[in-house]
Regions:
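Conserved beta-hairpin
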Residues: 1-36, 106-149
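Acidic, Ser/Thr- and proline-rich intrinsically disordered linker/docking segments
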Residues: 35-114, 148-209
Length: 209
């Protein structure tokens, strides 16, 4: 098992289960309000020869006690002059920090959304409003939908909703289906994605592997 002192990247580190440090300033983990994370690997090919994978990673830590979130970026090598295994190691270090913080702060971040749900009747995520009865209101025009009428799919950074349309029973129905694309929406999940997935699993019975 990794000790908390191993969760360190440049000027950011997890000191223990209650404290993080950034640029020699310490913050309480209980004051974390949101976490953002993304890790992307890109295959690098030079003259048709596979050179390995270049990795990028991003971590955002929002705090009650800091006016601006903490941002940690590793943008990858973008060059053949570095061993690509090194880029994976650096990205994995940031991912390990995220996973540890996500574990330590999961309940308090869930409680933030549940508090809004209790007071407003919905929780807000990625500018959309989610109601326990299955209604979702997106910020775009005509953005009020019933989640049960949509197919959900997921990528590493987004959830997509695509309208489920009944199979047409007439020739004209088939023509109309080809002419009109199903309504679709996207929800970016890089911030508090673990919490969002837990909430829609609980309220909408939607889950992935």
């Amino acid at each position: 098992n990794k000790s908390d002192l191993d969760y360190k990247y440049k000027k950011f580190s997890i000191m223990d289960d209650k404290t993080i440090e950034y640029k020699r300033e310490r913050f309480k983990i209980m004051d974390i309000t949101e976490l953002g994370f993304h890790h992307k690997g890109t295959k690098v090919v030079t003259n048709f020869v596979p050179m390995g994978e270049d990795h990028e990673a991003y971590l955002m830590v929002g705090l009650k006690t800091r006016s601006k979130p903490i941002h940690i970026n590793y943008r990858g090598a973008h060059t053949r002059k570095i061993i690509f295994e090194d880029t994976f190691t650096k990205a994995l270090t940031i991912e390990s920090i995220y996973r540890r913080l996500a574990e330590l702060t999961f309940k308090q971040r869930v409680d933030k959304y549940l508090s809004e749900l209790e007071s407003e009747g919905y929780f807000t995520y990625a500018q959309a409003k989610f109601f326990p009865n299955g209604e979702i209101i997106f910020p775009k025009k005509n953005g009020r939908v019933d989640q049960s009428n949509y197919h959900f799919s997921r990528t590493s950074s987004d959830v997509f909703l695509k309208e489920i349309k009944p199979e047409p029973t007439t020739v004209w129905g088939h023509v109309k289906k080809k002419l009109h694309d199903p309504i679709s929406y996207s929800i970016p999940t890089s911030v508090d994605g673990d919490v969002f997935f837990a909430l829609i699993k609980h309220y909408y019975k939607r889950s992935w592997g």
